[in-house]
Swiss-Prot record:
EC class name: hydrolase
Reaction equation(s) it catalyzes: Endonucleolytic cleavage to 5'-phosphomonoester
Annotated keywords: Cytoplasm, Endonuclease, Hydrolase, Magnesium, Metal-binding, mRNA processing, Nuclease, RNA-binding, rRNA processing, rRNA-binding, tRNA processing
Protein name, UniProt field: Ribonuclease 3
Domain annotation RNase III: ranges: 6-128
Domain of life from the UniProt record: Bacteria
Gene: rnc
Family according to the record: Belongs to the ribonuclease III family.
Enzyme Commission code: 3.1.26.3
NCBIfam families to which the protein is assigned, alphabetical: RNaseIII (TIGR02191)
GO MF entries: double-stranded RNA binding; metal ion binding; ribonuclease III activity; rRNA binding
Cofactor: Mg(2+)
Subunit structure comment from the entry: Homodimer.
List of catalytic residues: 45, 117
Length: 226
């Protein structure tokens, strides 16, 4: 992998790996090698959830568990992680197999999100919980400053349903129109038909549920509720 690209990535991350093999593994998709990033992703997912939960607990001392859970879900969901990945220009650093390269895997939201979690796991193993917590909070500083409790933090499907019910309109319908990839690494494409929109909106995700949420979010944007 190009050392110039790797050094630039580490500057953007705000962390230089002592063990570069952990960074290489974090950037390696299972399509490229048997030594891939899924175990690091598993670890990073749990660490991220803890760090964000801890930050919200101390920032919002009077907010109940339900609102904190919704805020955490907003901050750790796939599209938020993919946004962070794009800020780091992570796509050009990924190690992907030929099939994923050809199909544009370096742009795929689920792969970008998973890689951010793998990087978190890698930083933890390369250093300690204090370092990785500091790093995550630096990545999330603006988002933590901007987030607030309330209905805005309900998931998109719930908000879309409540909007339509409040206007006595039919509930949205979700249809799977495409499933790509192998069983362990699928991408679902969903069409969501919403009363008031002339065409179905499209959402993609690594599971049917995530794709439906993505479609609902697009519908909310078209309805100018997002």
């Amino acid at each position: 992998m190009n050392p110039i690209v790797i050094n630039r990535l580490q500057r953007k991350l705000g962390y230089t790996f002592h063990h570069q093999e952990l960074l290489q593994q974090a950037l390696t998709h299972r399509s490229a090698s048997s030594k891939h990033n899924e175990r690091l992703e598993f670890l990073g997912d749990s660490i991220l959830s803890f760090v964000i939960a801890n930050a919200l607990y101390h920032r919002f001392p009077r907010v109940d568990e339900g609102d904190m859970s919704r805020m955490r879900a907003t901050l750790v969901r796939g599209n938020t992680l993919a946004e962070i990945a794009r800020e780091f220009e992570l796509g050009e650093c990924l190690r992907l197999g030929p099939g994923e390269l050809k199909s544009g895997g370096f742009r795929r939201e689920s792969i970008l999100a998973d890689t951010v979690e793998a990087l978190i796991g890698g930083v933890f193993l390369d250093s300690d919980i204090q370092n990785v917590e500091r790093l995550i909070l630096s990545w999330y500083q603006t988002r933590l400053d901007e987030i607030s409790p309330g209905d805005k933090q309900k998931d998109p499907k719930t908000r879309l349903q409540e909007y339509l019910q409040g206007r006595h309109l039919p509930l949205p319908s979700y249809l799977v129109v495409q499933v790509r990839g192998e069983a362990h690494d699928q991408e679902f494409t969903i069409h969501c038909q919403v009363s008031g929109l002339s065409e179905p909106v499209v959402g993609t995700g690594s599971s049917r549920r995530k794709a439906e949420q993505a479609a609902a979010e697009q519908a909310l944007k078209k309805l100018e509720l997002e």
